Amino acid sequence: DEQIVDEAMKAVHAEDLGNRDFNAISDGQKQRVLLARAICQEPEIIVLDEPTSFLDVRYKLELLAILERMARKKHITVIMSLHEIDLAQKVSDKIICVKGDTIAHYGKPEEVFKEDTIRSLYEIDNGYFDPVFGSIELPKIEGEPEVFVISSGGSGIPIYRQLQKEHIPFAAGILYKNDIDYQLARLLAVEVITEEPFRQISDETFARAVEVMKKCKRVIVTDVPVGECNKRVEELIKLAK
């Protein structure tokens, strides 16, 4: 029995807690001890009710990593309820979405975590769920764009968020639809001027970018890498100056 307990404590990285007063340790440490207690019974299935509640980010990640390892190496089925949909998306093999007293959706994460599905499930009408980042975004600031952002490769994301926090409507472009900046710009920008991936920027797309940019009070340019396909972005930057 002592060997089983030692192995369980080791599995959840709680060896140093064996002689501690349970009431004196942190919430994250308590969760690990309780999990070790369950493992001692050598179950085939573990059911957990919101195991990450009241835990800080470090302990949430640590606990979920332990559960993943248990599922893979010890072949224990882990069933748990979570309100953090970003974590559920990253850690789960199958998802059950409960709305009221009804199972609204069931499937693999990539089948369930879609923008329209999450919007309907939680009745979101003042923001967005981004399935690419697994994040919740506040609503875009409406109105005529005051700032035009020229960016690429993730360099625009902190700028988009800052403008959104300052309630400044903005436009973004020219972005390819497979650019990571596009994934957030489409949710937060008033208008996004886009081009299809791996194509040279068309006259129509370039003209629209110039038109929108000229109406803005300011232009923000990040360190945009320019290549053969997007070389007209360089021309757009020169016009901005």
PLM-predicted stretches and their roles:
Residues 1-18:
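Conserved ABC ATPase "signature" region
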Residues 21-25, 29:
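Conserved ABC ATPase signature
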Residues 42:
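Conserved catalytic motifs of ABC-family nucleotide-binding domains
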Residues 46-50:
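Catalytic Walker B motif of ABC-type/P-loop ATPase nucleotide-binding domains
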Residues 61-74:
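Helical segment within the ABC ATPase nucleotide-binding domain
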Residues 96, 100-111:
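Conserved switch/coupling elements of ABC/ABC-like ATPase nucleotide-binding domains
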Residues 123-201, 221-222, 227-230, 241:
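ABC ATPase nucleotide-binding domains
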